[in-house]
């Protein structure tokens, strides 16, 4: 499992030091080494770290589907630390989260901005969380298409369509009115963890891990 497992955001990891910690486990059949992300995947933990783009989204989707196949009745925990990124890549993760049978719990560590915030809010109801010093930011989708005037007009209309769809989904997941979402995403809107909970983007702020009694 150590090779066909979770190897994500290698550039971010290399920038942080170049080495991924390894975990050694012993069993009756001897020792086995896992990189730390692979070991956590065994515990149904997935990391969404860095910009949301197609390659990273494919890895997250694959892990969601794998964990569903392993146990369709046990929660999956998605840890998010992302500045946002591609809408289409993010929507592939979103649709898979809604499609699979297990509940997907979302936890923001660091930041969840733009598409990262959208995915944070898309977790299972009652299972969306932030750590206390993380931040969340929502805004409207960005566009920067260049080309012929007619093509620019086509892409501008598509951005408006995407904006409308994202606003509808965000209203659904937060419980806010559509008009409130439209107003609050007009510009970059940063929130503390506590404010994100008040707004409905998350359900609670975690100070300490909740241990089973």
Curated annotation (Swiss-Prot):
Concerning SUPFAM superfamilies, the annotation shows: ClpP/crotonase
Reactions the enzyme catalyzes: Hydrolysis of proteins to small peptides in the presence of ATP and magnesium. alpha-casein is the usual test substrate. In the absence of ATP, only oligopeptides shorter than five residues are hydrolyzed (such as succinyl-Leu-Tyr-|-NHMec, and Leu-Tyr-Leu-|-Tyr-Trp, in which cleavage of the -Tyr-|-Leu- and -Tyr-|-Trp bonds also occurs)
InterPro entries in alphabetical order: ClpP, ClpP/crotonase-like_dom_sf, ClpP/TepA, ClpP_His_AS, ClpP_Ser_AS
Which key words are in the record?
Answer: Cytoplasm, Hydrolase, Protease, Serine protease
GO MF: ATP-dependent peptidase activity; ATPase binding; serine-type endopeptidase activity
- According to its UniProt record, this protein's enzyme class is hydrolase
Is Transferase a UniProt keyword of this protein?
no
Q: Which domain of life is it from?
A: Bacteria
Q: Where is the active site?
A: 114, 139
Q: Which PROSITE patterns match?
A: CLP_PROTEASE_HIS, CLP_PROTEASE_SER
- One cellular component term from this protein's GO annotations in UniProt: endopeptidase Clp complex
**EC id:** 3.4.21.92
Q: Where in the cell is it found?
A: Cytoplasm
Per the UniProt entry, what is one GO biological process? protein quality control for misfolded or incompletely synthesized proteins
Regarding protein family, the annotation reads: Belongs to the peptidase S14 family.
Subunit (UniProt): Fourteen ClpP subunits assemble into 2 heptameric rings which stack back to back to give a disk-like structure with a central cavity, resembling the structure of eukaryotic proteasomes.
| Main function | Cleaves peptides in various proteins in a process that requires ATP hydrolysis. Has a chymotrypsin-like activity. Plays a major role in the degradation of misfolded proteins.
> In its UniProt entry, what is this protein called?
ATP-dependent Clp protease proteolytic subunit
Question: Quick one: which gene encodes this?
Answer: clpP
């Amino acid at each position: 499992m150590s090779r066909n497992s979770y190897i994500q955001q290698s550039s971010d990891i290399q920038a942080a030091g170049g080495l991924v910690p390894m975990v050694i486990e012993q069993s009756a059949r001897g020792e086995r080494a896992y990189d730390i992300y692979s070991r956590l995947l065994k515990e149904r933990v997935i990391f969404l770290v860095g910009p949301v783009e197609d390659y990273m989204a494919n890895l997250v989707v694959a892990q969601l589907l794998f964990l569903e196949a392993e146990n369709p009745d046990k929660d999956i925990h998605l840890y998010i630390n992302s500045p946002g990124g591609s809408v289409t890549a993010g929507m592939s993760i979103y649709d898979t989260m809604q499609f699979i049978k297990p509940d997907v719990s979302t936890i923001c560590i660091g930041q969840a901005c733009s598409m990262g915030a959208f995915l944070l809010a898309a977790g299972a109801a009652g299972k969306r969380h932030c750590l206390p010093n993380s931040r969340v930011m929502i805004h409207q989708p960005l566009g920067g298409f260049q080309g012929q005037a007619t093509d620019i007009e086509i892409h501008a209309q598509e951005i408006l369509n995407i904006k409308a769809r994202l606003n509808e989904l965000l209203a659904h997941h937060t419980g806010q009115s559509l008009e409130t979402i439209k107003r609050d995403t007009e510009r970059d809107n940063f929130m503390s963890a506590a404010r994100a909970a008040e707004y409905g983007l998350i359900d609670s702020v975690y100070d300490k891990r909740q241990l089973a009694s």
